[in-house]
């Protein structure tokens, strides 16, 4: 047996012995009749206590004579004879308990408290005071075991080091990792901030189907499921777009939705098959209005959630305080590949030659617009570090966007980039029913030619457009990627509580 395997076997034996001892303690509690009591009530959380009393001097706290009730998980314990110090962790953070034998009912300290284990959930009552080192603490007069933990916590010095285990057992990650807890608290604040921002501007939050007969609103491979009662194959939605625009046809002129999308694609540091998007639609607006709204949204969130428009990310600092850069797709190609002759981007053969020269395999189904977009992705996207809007996307790769009035080969569309990755996509919506029908047909032809991500033909959506969609602009923002930026996280798994994982065999 190798040294590594031997160590692993020893760890399993240690865990089994630890769990056996803990189960024996639980059995003793069961004999006493109340192994999992549910009659303890706390009146404060640790962060509330620190916010209210950290600034007070020891003498002032003693004079106030404040009694509090707290509950949480025992993370550390230092037993020093007749007295002990405990670190209790709750949703707000940590608070120290001072536990003295003579201040508790007879037998509690030696017969109960000293036999409890790290990870157990406790309830404590007592008076606030400060130690000689100035740490806010609770001098316990009552201490109860509320939940017996049968498994030990991760090593207190090293935490949960295995990345796979962090994602598979997120509960352990959250117990032992302050950074993870703060990431998901920030995510919650971002979502609340988005909702507040949108409602303040007259948008109504709505919900649209997660299972669809025809998946639409994006170019992606869908997940397929089966509805037994209807005996019908259905698709998990890849985007809510077409349903949201139906609502605009119906008269809801400003709508937004924050919800899950599902795309049957690869998993990477940027991609999870199940992800969260915010989409909005705004009648009587164009893509330029949404550029302004997007800039305002990110600036507002940075200030309100993080308290600063300068947001650190790795070695970079994103500046949301100054005006965001704006480039057309072709300007970006020229900027990051200066040798490009702009005239070559207007010619299929010349553009194809450029694409192949930089390692792009050009599919037979691609037209000029797709080739130019692929060139942009290859030469420019990774360089768009500071907040940047890219405009003038080809109509070929924008089947739902409105054609530009001056040049019908491009659309009134933008994508928003930060840190070298796309964060948002918006455009003036196509509201010409006949043009939309033709573009759907073009997508059907592309699918027949082998493009698995091409869109389906949605006849009912065309029917909705035939009733009249007002001039409208729409925007989609990837919430997971947004959270990555605001929390300095470099893999999407760090900002999704339960990311997709291959099952353990």
Curated annotation (Swiss-Prot):
State where the protein is found: Cytoplasm
* GO cellular component term, pick one: cytosol
This protein's UniProt keywords: Aminoacyl-tRNA synthetase, ATP-binding, Cytoplasm, Ligase, Magnesium, Metal-binding, Nucleotide-binding, Protein biosynthesis
Q: Which PROSITE patterns match?
A: AA_TRNA_LIGASE_II (PS50862)
Q: What is its EC number?
A: 6.1.1.6
CDD domains cross-referenced by the UniProt entry: LysRS_core (cd00775), LysRS_N (cd04322)
* Gene Ontology molecular function, alphabetical: ATP binding; lysine-tRNA ligase activity; magnesium ion binding; tRNA binding
Q: What is its main location?
A: cytoplasm
Q: Which InterPro entries match?
A: Aa-tRNA-synt_II (IPR004364), aa-tRNA-synth_II (IPR006195), aa-tRNA-synth_II/BPL/LPL (IPR045864), Lys-tRNA-ligase_II (IPR002313), Lys-tRNA-ligase_II_bac/euk (IPR034762), Lys-tRNA-ligase_II_N (IPR044136), Lys-tRNA-synth_II_C (IPR018149), NA-bd_OB-fold (IPR012340)
Q: What class of enzyme is it?
A: ligase
UniProt remark on cofactor binding: Binds 3 Mg(2+) ions per subunit.
Instruction: Tell me its cofactors.
Output: Mg(2+)
Among Pfam families, the record links this protein to: tRNA-synt_2, tRNA_anti-codon
Q: Which GO terms describe its biological process?
A: lysyl-tRNA aminoacylation
Complex formation = Homodimer.
What name does this protein carry?
Answer: Lysine--tRNA ligase
Gene, per the UniProt record = lysS
């Amino acid at each position: 047996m190798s040294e590594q395997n031997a160590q692993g076997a020893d760890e399993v034996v240690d865990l089994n012995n630890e769990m056996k001892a803990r189960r024996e303690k639980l059995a003793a509690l069961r004999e006493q009749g109340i192994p999992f009591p549910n009659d303890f009530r706390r009146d404060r959380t640790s962060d509330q206590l620190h916010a209210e009393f950290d600034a007070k001097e020891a003498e002032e706290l003693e004079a106030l004579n404040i009694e509090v009730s707290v509950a949480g998980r025992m993370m550390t314990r230092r037993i020093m004879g007749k007295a002990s110090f405990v670190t209790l962790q709750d949703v707000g953070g940590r608070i120290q308990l001072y536990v003295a034998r003579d201040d508790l009912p007879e037998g509690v300290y030696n017969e109960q408290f000293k036999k409890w284990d790290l990870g157990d959930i406790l309830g404590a009552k007592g008076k606030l005071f400060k130690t000689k080192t100035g740490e806010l603490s609770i001098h316990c007069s009552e201490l109860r075991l509320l939940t017996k933990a049968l498994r030990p916590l991760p090593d207190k010095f090293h935490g949960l080091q295995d990345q796979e285990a962090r994602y598979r057992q997120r509960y352990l990650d959250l117990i032992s990792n302050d950074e993870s807890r703060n990431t998901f608290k920030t995510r919650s604040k971002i979502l609340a901030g988005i909702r507040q921002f949108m409602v303040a501007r007259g948008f109504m939050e709505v919900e649209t189907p997660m299972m669809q007969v025809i998946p639409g609103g994006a170019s992606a491979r869908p997940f397929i499921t089966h509805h037994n009662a209807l005996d019908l194959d259905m698709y998990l939605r890849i985007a809510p777009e077409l349903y949201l625009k139906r609502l605009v046809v119906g008269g809801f002129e400003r709508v937004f939705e924050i919800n899950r999308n599902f795309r049957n694609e690869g998993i990477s540091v940027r991609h999870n098959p199940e992800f969260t998007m915010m989409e909005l639609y705004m009648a009587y607006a164009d893509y330029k209005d949404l550029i302004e709204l997007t800039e305002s949204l990110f600036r507002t969130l940075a200030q309100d959630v993080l308290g600063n428009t300068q947001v650190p990310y790795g070695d970079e600092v994103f500046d949301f305080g100054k005006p965001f850069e704006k480039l057309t797709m072709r300007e970006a190609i020229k900027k990051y590949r200066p040798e490009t002759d702009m005239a070559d981007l207007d010619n299929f053969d010349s553009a194809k030659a450029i694409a192949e020269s930089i390692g792009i395999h050009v599919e037979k189904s691609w037209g000029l617009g797709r080739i130019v977009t692929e060139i942009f992705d290859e030469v420019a996207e990774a360089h768009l570090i500071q907040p940047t809007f890219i405009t003038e996307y080809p109509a070929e790769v924008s089947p739902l966007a409105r054609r530009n009035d001056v040049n019908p080969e491009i659309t009134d569309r933008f994508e928003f980039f930060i840190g070298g990755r796309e964060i948002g996509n918006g455009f003036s919506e196509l509201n010409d029913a006949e043009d939309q029908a033709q573009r759907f047909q073009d997508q059907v032809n592309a699918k027949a030619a082998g493009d698995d991500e091409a869109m389906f033909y949605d006849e009912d959506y065309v029917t909705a457009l035939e009733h009249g969609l007002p001039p409208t602009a729409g925007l989609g923002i990837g919430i997971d990627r947004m959270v990555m930026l605001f929390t300095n996280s470099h893999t999407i798994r760090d900002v999704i509580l339960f990311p997709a994982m291959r099952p353990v065999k």
